[in-house]
Regions:
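Alpha-helical membrane-protein architecture signal
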Residues: 25, 29, 119, 123-127
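Alpha-helical membrane-embedding segments
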Residues: 122-128, 154-159
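Membrane helix-loop-helix hairpins that form the core translocation module of multi-pass transporters
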Residues: 22, 52-120, 169-180, 185, ...
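Hydrophobic/aromatic residues within the transmembrane alpha-helices of Major Facilitator Superfamily
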Residues: 32, 36, 66-67, 101, ...
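Hydrophobic alpha-helical transmembrane segments in multi-pass integral membrane proteins
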Residues: 131-142, 195-204
Length: 204
């Protein structure tokens, strides 16, 4: 007969599951809020208005984000393994505070990132989103989150889910969404969230 300890999950297993869930939920929340009003959300509005084909646009966003954030997450994991804990703590704290300040600045699309040409909605969206995310605050946040949490899969899944939560409604609402979303208020919420994470990292 199996003992109660064997039949129930061990404390270590429960802790690991909680850590994975925390990494996923925090990553989702941070990126979903930070993405609202970001240039990639504006890009989703532009592509949706241009193509009027939401499904390939959404798949383009999904795969571009997975690819881009997986690379960012790998970098964050390497930083976590290579950097001393005290240096990592200060680096993460200051990074989140810097992203908080960055979140207060409105994004805009200065020019068309990818010419439409003969390419389809999926290809244009994939390339445009991948390029737009390079150096963007959500990519930098993914690096920091992957360095903060010891779970690449949970972080990348969370940041990708956050991107979709913010961008999919924009695809379906197209240009009507941009006039109704309180971007300024949401930027302040995003900045406060990043700042709180920065303070928490420094206080550990």
């Amino acid at each position: 007969m199996r003992s109660g300890a064997q039949s129930c999950g061990s404390p270590a297993s429960s802790w690991a599951e909680d850590a994975l869930l925390e990494a996923f939920l925090v990553s989702t929340l941070v990126v979903a809020i930070g993405e609202i009003g970001d240039k990639t959300q504006l890009l989703a509005l532009i592509l949706a208005a241009r193509f009027r084909r939401p499904v390939p646009i959404i798949f383009g966003i999904l795969f571009a984000t997975l690819f881009n954030h997986a690379l960012a997450g790998l970098l964050g994991g390497w930083i976590r393994a290579a950097v001393a804990p005290d240096v990592l703590r200060w680096g993460l704290g200051l990074s989140f505070l810097a992203i908080a300040a960055w979140a207060l600045k409105p994004d805009k699309m200065d020019e068309e990132p990818v010419a439409i040409g003969k390419y389809g909605a999926f290809a244009v969206t994939f390339v445009a989103f991948f390029l737009a995310e390079i150096g963007d605050k959500t990519q930098i946040a993914t690096v920091a989150l992957a360095a903060r949490f010891d779970s690449l899969v949970a972080v990348v899944a969370g940041t990708t889910a956050g991107m979709l939560i913010a961008d999919v409604p924009a695809v379906f609402l197209a240009d009507r969404a941009s006039t109704r979303i309180p971007f300024k208020a949401i930027r302040y919420v995003a900045a406060a969230l990043f700042a709180a994470m920065g303070v928490a990292a420094l206080a550990i």
